[in-house]
Amino acid sequence: MRRGARAAAAAGAAPLEAGGGWRARARPVPGGGRYPAGDFCSRCGLCDTYYVAQVGEACAFLGPGMARAEALEERVHGRGRDAASDERHFGVFQERFAAAMAPPVDGAQWTGTVTSVAIAALESGLVEAVVCVQSHPDDPLRPMPAIARTREEVLASRGVKPSLSPSLEVLAEVEAQGIRRLLFIGVGCQVIALRSVEHHLRAAGLEELYVMGTFCADNGHAEGLQKFLRETSCDPATVTGYEFMQDYRVHLKHSTGQYEKIPYFCLDANTLSEGVIAPSCASCFDYVNSLADLVVGYMAVPYMQVPMTAHPTIVHVRNRRGVELLEPVRGRMVETPLEDSGDRKPFVLETLLSDDRAALGRVQAPAPLPVGEALATVLEKVGPKGLEFARYSIDYHSLRSALKVKRGFSAKHAGQHIPSYAAATFAEYDKGGALSERTQWSSWAEEEAAQVAKRRRRLDAALAALSSARGLRRFALPLLTVAALLGAVAFGAANYTG
């Protein structure tokens, strides 16, 4: 069941506020208009309805921004996260496990855990409706938010649509239909905004709100998705989904049922660094969807050499409502032990520096396929696995977002936007101020000049030390010359090898 969001906004305003009020006065952003968060807007859909009036208190990219999630955790879950535990990375949770649905849901991206939970919630009467994302009739990867009231309507939302979705555009319609018990399925930026306006929904008649989330990173606009597929796949028109797996390859699922696997190292970072990932996603700190009641995702499960449609995912149960959502389907899930091994930290910094240099404009040729395959095979054996791989991904995305925010936001806005746990991660990796220094650079030329200046200072310091050493003064100039030559050769080799 779906109507145009702006029509629903108009229809829903009068019965809610016959005497006027913010709903009646609000003016949704018109088609093609500029959204309040500008280039950093995640197109969550809030501003496409009369809820645009609440954007200042709800938007994940205005004012406190992503830090809103941290402030809301206690209200949503009954407590904030324990930053001294694994909750620093994964958010509040009371239970987590890896599992697959048995049998899997036909047509799902994975085994259909999200779909199964939504259908069970609807058919058990736990909720009256489910806000989900169906596919546009003209493009299966184009998201189309919907209010589902039947099994068939939920099944129509199977599969991941890896681009920005205006899911909150249905809020006015939810109110217009008088829905009392609702399940919302969405990603972090949407859920932050939803939780921020939840009290308005309750004032309008909503009695219970359940939120099921997915892990989310690196989405973009539809054009960015198409660019990624063109640059990555040999047959982009038949791709129905993809995932960056723990075997260090991106797995692209095709409508034929075949999988195409490309090593991370064979992706063209220079081409993909522009126009693929939305600025909002590149400045996000809620990869783990911390305000959802129940979260389902892949990133913490090692690759098990089976297709995605048979592969376990990880489930985080955050609170009582999460337990209620999961209980009806728990008996149909096959659980597998969680793995946690390796050391993420060296991999985090290498990935961050490589990607950031590409973002700054440094030309880096992708690895030839045989080299990429060899690297992926080795790293799958020696790199972080399971939960540690997830921490690697979370740390990397958090640091990348911090660099983006510190460069693109004012100092005040950046300080508001970055949650304390993300700031702690930045400080942990900012040894000697190396990351803070990077925030001052806006191009590869600036980084290159800074590195040359740093080498020159080191040489000057060495010369000064040699010059002051008794009996070594006559050797200072020859030693300096040799050091300079060796430094030049090393710098050239580093740039040549990428």
Where are these regions (language model features)?
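Terminal signal-anchor or tail-anchor transmembrane helices
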Residues: 473-498
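Long, compositionally biased charged/polar accessory segments in the mid-to-C-terminal portions
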Residues: 127, 232-463
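N-terminal mitochondrial targeting presequence
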Residues: 1-24
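Iron-sulfur cluster-binding cysteine motifs and their immediate structural context
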Residues: 19-77, 294
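A short alpha->loop->secondary-structure connector
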Residues: 199-213
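Low-complexity, highly charged intrinsically disordered N-terminal segments
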Residues: 68, 108-141
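Entry/capping segment at the start of metal-dependent catalytic domains
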Residues: 58-114
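Short, conserved secondary-structure transition motifs
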Residues: 215-227
